[in-house]
């Protein structure tokens, strides 16, 4: 194979890696934790990843001491956990 062909193959493999969604085995373990409102009573809006529905959902967050499957924005949740 020529060096141009190898370069093209390398470019395509790199693009495939970047565009391939996160698989369930690659998700951080905390993405499988349930929504956790925490122990405080602030009741603000937050997001968590629901592995059954395979998407990020909104929930009421108390403001402190929740698990790691708690995100301030839906985009942060999607970047971390969603496939």
Curated annotation (Swiss-Prot):
Additional free-text comment from the UniProt record: Negative results: does not inhibit vasopressin V2 receptor (V2R/AVPR2).
Keyword entries, A-Z: Disulfide bond, Protease inhibitor, Secreted, Serine protease inhibitor, Signal
Organism from which the protein derives: Drysdalia coronoides
Disulphide-bridged cysteine pairs: 31-81, 40-64, 56-77
One GO CC term on file: extracellular space
Record localization: Secreted
Protein name stated in the entry: Kunitz-type serine protease inhibitor 18
Keyword Metal-binding: no
Domain BPTI/Kunitz inhibitor: 31-81
Domain of life: Eukaryota
InterPro entries: Kunitz_BPTI, Kunitz_BPTI_sf, Prtase_inh_Kunz-CS, TFPI/VKTCI-like
Family as reported in the entry's similarity comment: Belongs to the venom Kunitz-type family.
Secretion signal span: 1-24
Tissues in which the UniProt entry reports expression: Expressed by the venom gland.
GO MF: serine-type endopeptidase inhibitor activity
Site (Reactive bond for chymotrypsin): 41-42
Major localization class: secreted
Gene3D superfamilies recorded: Pancreatic trypsin inhibitor Kunitz domain
Function of the molecule: Serine protease inhibitor.
């Amino acid at each position: 194979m020529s060096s141009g062909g190898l370069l093209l193959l390398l470019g395509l493999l790199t693009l495939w890696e970047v565009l391939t969604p996160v698989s369930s085995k690659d998700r951080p373990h905390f993405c499988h934790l349930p929504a956790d409102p925490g122990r405080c009573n602030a009741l603000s809006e937050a997001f968590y990843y629901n592995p059954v529905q395979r998407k990020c959902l909104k929930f009421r967050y108390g403001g402190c001491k929740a698990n790691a499957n708690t995100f301030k924005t839906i985009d942060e949740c999607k970047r971390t956990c969603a496939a």
